[in-house]
A protein has these predicted regions:
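Short hinge/loop at the helix->beta-strand junction immediately C-terminal to the helix-turn-helix recognition helix
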Residues: 29, 40, 57-58, 207
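Positively charged, proline/Ser/Thr-rich regional signature most characteristic
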Residues: 109, 115-180, 212
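Amphipathic alpha-helical dimerization/coiled-coil segments
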Residues: 3, 79-129, 212
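Alpha-helical residues within the helix-turn-helix
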Residues: 37, 54-55
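Short, hydrophobic-biased segments on the C-terminal half of alpha helices
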Residues: 21-24, 50-51, 199
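Catalytic cysteine-centered active loop of the rhodanese-like fold, especially the PTP/DSP P-loop
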Residues: 33, 58, 160-203
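N-terminal helix-turn-helix DNA-binding core of bacterial DNA-binding proteins
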Residues: 3-42, 68-75
Length: 214
């Protein structure tokens, strides 16, 4: 019996496979080619890692003509990845040091997610999603506006109400897209903060997720 359990742990025992699982948690499904490009892997290498995740039932796949698409096998797969990640941060000093160096300049905005939702509903907060637009359409926090990296320009900023607090999120606590967006907003005089939760973490807390372009 225990040997069967190791099929799951063995599939997770590779940084590329963990990254692929994290990327799949952001969207309903993605092609092997798309995942390979995002993870900086060759298509052949990405395909090999994805087959390992498939064998452990952490992901599912479908074929459409010459393309193969993958998706997470369920919320359990995402929770397992999050639990491994959070355990490593809690238990390994070297991981905590790496995380501390990466997030040293952050000023997280949320201790109370329910309070953030209320502020968004009252129009006090402008919420932005710094992930690629395809991930936004697949699922995003209610009230968020898609703002992929590189889309913050003078025309965009001129249309914003400077009296509103800006909150930006991306793929989760270790994604840096939101950090770059927050820095850009602050350079232009906005009060801007980083939300460390991503869509998978938001969903795990039991809050609703919106889909589509708005």
């Amino acid at each position: 019996m225990y040997g069967q359990f190791t099929r799951v742990s063995a599939a997770l025992a590779n940084p590329h496979r963990l990254e692929l699982l994290d990327l799949l948690a952001q969207r309903e499904e993605r092609s092997v080619e798309d995942l390979a490009a995002d993870a900086g892997l060759s298509v052949a290498n990405a395909s090999q890692h994805l087959r390992q995740l498939l064998a452990a039932h952490l992901v599912e796949s479908r074929r459409s003509q010459q393309f193969v698409f993958y998706r997470v096998a369920g919320d359990e797969s995402v929770r397992l990845w999050q639990d491994v990640r959070d355990f490593a941060v809690a238990r390994f000093g070297e991981v905590r040091d790496l995380v501390a160096g990466r997030v040293a300049d952050r000023n997280p905005v949320v201790d109370d997610v329910a309070a953030l939702i209320e502020r968004i509903d009252r129009g006090e907060v402008a919420l932005f999603d710094a992930r690629p637009s395809e991930e936004f359409r697949s699922g995003h926090l209610p009230g968020a506006t898609s703002l992929p990296l590189g889309h913050i320009d003078d025309v965009f900023l001129a249309a914003l109400d400077t009296s509103r607090t800006v909150v930006v999120y991306c793929r989760g606590p270790f994604c840096t897209f939101a950090d770059e967006a927050v820095a850009a907003f602050r350079e232009h005089g906005f009060t801007a903060h980083r939300l460390e939760l991503g869509v998978p973490e938001w969903r795990r807390l039991g809050f609703a997720v919106a889909v589509g372009d708005s």
